[in-house]
C-alpha cells in the first residue's frame, strides 16, 4: 500500500549552530509546530533545501519525499511528507516538548 501524504507544520531557525530537530512547541491556542534549526542561510532556497534534507534524515525517508507546501519565504512552513501516518505519528510523539 503506498504512503499517503502527511502534512507537518514547522518553525525554522536558519543560520543556526547545527542542523537539528529541536522538538515540538505548542502555542496557547493549541497549534503545534516542530521546531527545526538549520545551519544554511535563508538565501536562494538554501535553508529550504536543508529543511527537506533534515526532515528526510530524521524520518528515514528520501529527500524527494519531503516538499514545502507553504511558507517558502517564512520561518513558519507547512511540509508535505510521503510517509505513512502511523510512522509519522510515532516519530512526532517521541519528540521532546519545548
Can you describe what each PLM-predicted range is?
Residues 1-44, 48-52, 63, 67-73, ...:
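Contiguous, often N-terminal, cationic amphipathic patches that form binding interfaces
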Amino acid at each position: 500500500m503506498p504512503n499517503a501524504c502527511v502534512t507537518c507544520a514547522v518553525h525554522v531557525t536558519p543560520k543556526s549552530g547545527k542542523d537539528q530537530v529541536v522538538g515540538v512547541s505548542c502555542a496557547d491556542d493549541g497549534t503545534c509546530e516542530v521546531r527545526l534549526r538549520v545551519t544554511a542561510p535563508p538565501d536562494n532556497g538554501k535553508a529550504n533545501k536543508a529543511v527537506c534534507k533534515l526532515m528526510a534524515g530524521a524520518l528515514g525517508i528520501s529527500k524527494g519525499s519531503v516538499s514545502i507546501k507553504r511558507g517558502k519565504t517564512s520561518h513558519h512552513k507547512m511540509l508535505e511528507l510521503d510517509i505513512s501516518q502511523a510512522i509519522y505519528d510515532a516519530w512526532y510523539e517521541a519528540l521532546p516538548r519545548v
